[in-house]
Amino acid sequence: MIQEALAKQLLEETFARMNPGEAMEPGRKKYAELRVRRAERRVSCTGNLYQKAREALTEQETVLEEEPDSHLLLSTGSGLGRQNPAVVELEFDADSVTLTAWAKEGLIPQRTAQGAIKGMLELLGL
């Protein structure tokens, strides 16, 4: 599993790609100050879902890292209008998949990390 510091870095890089240009610099600085929230969910399945997940998720999400048959790390949009970046890690074994998501949130929690997991599970049909 990736560490929170790496998740924070990946979130900030994704936010910068989603909001390019000099005019967005104040927004990027403010985003960097937000807290990272984490959510995790383990789901039982029959057989290793890696290939199905890779095919279904990489059409819509950005692959940041992968290890065949066991690990995917994706960048996705979550929250209202998919405007808040989330980083989701999927770890596969013979009979389950564990999804761990990180997202930044302000004073009012929007449960963006949980929403990212829910979206991934829907794409996987779980």
Predicted feature residues:
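Ser/Thr-rich, low-complexity intrinsically disordered terminal regions
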Residues: 1-126
